[in-house]
């Protein structure tokens, strides 16, 4: 079995377990929730199989939906994030994305931070708009997106530093 495949399997299981056991129970003031399980989609190898990523993103989201007993907004948000990932790479990294020289989990520079921030905001915006699903609640969804996005971004950056402490 390839080392990258093993790392991805362990990352999938570890992030989903951490989400289920710790982060699903954490909220700040009832507005900000943390969803670091999306790090799996963010840290998936640039040159990895895109169809497999879409399938794994759906599986990751549907597992989260099962844990929270929700109707599928996590699955939709994860699949949309996985689908938009190449566009986000092009926006954040420009031409270097084409040569697949990017490793998100090495160190956090402005390009990587921009990619992570955009990924988190897109995921959360889709998630909360699907959860609220009323025009009158759009401001509440935007507030939850902003607060949860900041919370998730901080946790994701800390997690990346904890995963690869020797490379910083």
Name what the model sees in each region.
Residues 1-168:
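Terminal, non-globular segments
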